[in-house]
Amino acid sequence: MSKRCASDRDDKDSEPVKKPRFSIANILDEVEDEEDVEVDVEDVDDVDLSSIPSKSPERSRGRPKIGLKMKEGNLPIECKLEGSELWAKFFDLGTEMIITKSGRRMFPTVKVSFTNVILDALYYIFLDVVPVDSKRYRYIYNKSAWLTAGKAEPVPKNRYYLHPDSPFTGDQLLKHVISFEKTKLTNNEVDKTGHLILNSMHKYQPRIHIVQRQKANPLDPNKVVMSEEKHCTYTFPETQFMAVTAYQNQLITKLKIEKNPFAKGFRDPTGRSPDEMERSPGDMMLSNFYHSSALQQAMFQQCLSKTLQLNPSIMMLYQNVFPTGNSLPAAPTVPGNPAEISIKSE
């Protein structure tokens, strides 16, 4: 009998404890599965960038070797990704690119250079973006990670974006870096402006294509078939990105604001760059004094001086402020500043 009781007790201890439907544990589990609130760069005024950690808490992404590339084709031409260090920084966090109906430019920008070309040949440089896999993703904010969320949506027809300065001679390619800064990404399936059409929450890989032709036989860019051309295709794994309609990872938002020269208006309410923000407190106080109180006082005195010139009788009202007579005191200046202001009445 005692053995049976002991056995029954063990069975009860081994049974999983059922949590009430509305328990705190259940509520916390549901919160864990919620999707992140989208944050676009236009809304960063509500984001405290100083509170965002500089490193992502998620697991390592297996950073690719800088300069590593995959090459396909029948030409001996070599291609190098310029700015690969910046791309690697974004890759470590999980690069995101905004797509809109009207089209949005990429940052970082795809920039490449070429070697082993024929100097007098013609070269056409293309960029396209292809899906990495057949999955759709979602971003889990409290885990700082992208997770699969089902099968991919139908893939839009692939487009090649021809660099607007094509064709290049081999000599020109050796002397210049080819930048696709004007390339735009869109989610408009009926786009007719030549933008690259992508699906949001899908992962993509940019590719560079170079097609060689002789000057006597130029290429029609609207009828190009890569497999029928003398060409090479280059893929740099660190340029992979997630297409989004609003930035999901706040670390990506922070890095884009820091590195994108067109986002300087979002960096600091005072307009200071990161280098200026690292200056000593004394320098910052001096700079703030010059740009605020000194400048405002000088402007006020200039307006007052002009008013007194037009109506000298008003001076009677300011005897307590200016006891020296008709002369206004000079505005304070900052020694050594090339833009010193010192305004006196004439």
From Swiss-Prot:
* UniProt keyword annotation of Lyase present: no
Q: Where is the composition biased (Acidic residues)?
A: 33-48
Q: What happens when the gene is disrupted?
A: RNAi-mediated knockdown by injection into the gonad results in male progeny with grossly abnormal tails with no spicules. Hermaphrodite progeny are constipated and show backward uncoordination.
- Pfam family membership, one: T-box
User: Which GO BP annotation is one of this protein's?
Assistant: negative regulation of transcription by RNA polymerase II
- Say what the protein does: Transcription factor. Involved in cell fate determination; required to pattern the posterior hindgut. Involved in motor neuron fate determination and maintenance, acting as a transcriptional repressor to counteract gene activation by transcription factor unc-3 in a subset of motor neurons. Required throughout development to repress transcription by unc-3, probably acting by binding to specific promoter elements. Represses expression of VA and VB motor neuron-specific effector genes, such as DEG/ENaC channel del-1 and the innexin inx-12, in DA and DB motor neurons.
A GO term, aspect molecular function: RNA polymerase II cis-regulatory region sequence-specific DNA binding
Task: Note down the stretches annotated as region Disordered.
Answer: 33-66
Main location (coarse class): nucleus
This protein's GO CC annotations: chromatin; nucleus
Query: SUPFAM superfamilies, per this entry?
Result: p53-like transcription factors (SSF49417)
> Keywords assigned by UniProt?
Developmental protein, DNA-binding, Nucleus, Transcription, Transcription regulation
Q: Per the database entry, where does the chain bind DNA?
A: 86-268
Q: What's the protein here called? A: T-box protein 12
Q: Which organism is it from?
A: Caenorhabditis elegans
Location relative to the cell: Nucleus
